[in-house]
């Protein structure tokens, strides 16, 4: 999702690199080393993780911030947790899902109560598969949907926090004299 979302948020003057991990254990195991090893003094790090089955998003974020602190570069890190899964972001913008999956009528479901506050949906990936008739596929679907997500969508607080944080980092980077 970040692959197709970041170009829509960031200025063309900012180059970025995405590093995918093989699940949350791999992320937690390698994150400190990856951040510490990055030699570019302008590098900033956006760490995005699903909450998955963990009951406490604050504890997950605190743990990741602790790992960032150990790297010595916490001031350059932005940690965001998708409540409960990344699919929550998509359920907050069914028009984007509809465009990505060529399902024009999907947006009409947005006013249903559960889709007005998607961060509260217990199993967003299951809900997304259900509402799309199994047309949504995690990797390909995420990439495609990211192209259409409305950046100012306020239905998902976790999505709004991600976009706001990335924009703040962008502002800080662009203010650094080169």
Task: Describe each region flagged by the PLM.
Residues 3-19, 25-44, 51-178:
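C-terminal accessory helical subdomains adjacent to catalytic cores in phosphodiester-
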